[in-house]
Amino acid sequence: DHLQALVQDNAQLIRIARPYLMNLFQYLRETKHQITIVDAHGCILDTIFDDGTSQAPPIQYPISNGTIFSEEESGTNGISLCLSLEKPVMVFGPEHFQQRFHNSICYAAPIHDQFHHLIGCVDISGPLANYHPSALTMLESAINSIERELSFRQTNAVLTSALDAFTEG
């Protein structure tokens, strides 16, 4: 399955990002927002939301893992704009191309590896009526922590490999 392969290819990103995003989600829990981890091509890899006891989706439209939010697939949206600009963005209501998102707000911020290559983004989406003025700032802080941990782990893996090669040789 294509989605399983993408998730496996991005397993380290998901594993590192999820705890930071779960912490961030605690501040957004009552606002019916959801948080998605997205690869560099706009494919949703992982989603965090509170389904609680409600049968209704957390926001007005379903977003599931495997959904593609590239500019070509979905028009202007928080994910596609963030990935193309490689900058944090907010997309309000009718700024979305698709009318079904006109009652929504998206906050998205890119994730870069230690070499500053774009590897994906994180998107927070929810009802426009529940606009949260600090959401993008909190997201950027979480992304900063995720990037630092990714860099640390990547550097540690290289050093461990070099040390292993040195001790074996």
Language-model region placement:
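A short beta-strand signature within small-molecule sensing/ligand-binding domains used
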Residues: 100-110
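Membrane-proximal, non-catalytic sensory/regulatory domains of signal-transducing membrane proteins
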Residues: 89-101
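Fold-independent oxyanion-binding glycine-rich loops
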Residues: 40, 85, 93-95, 109, ...
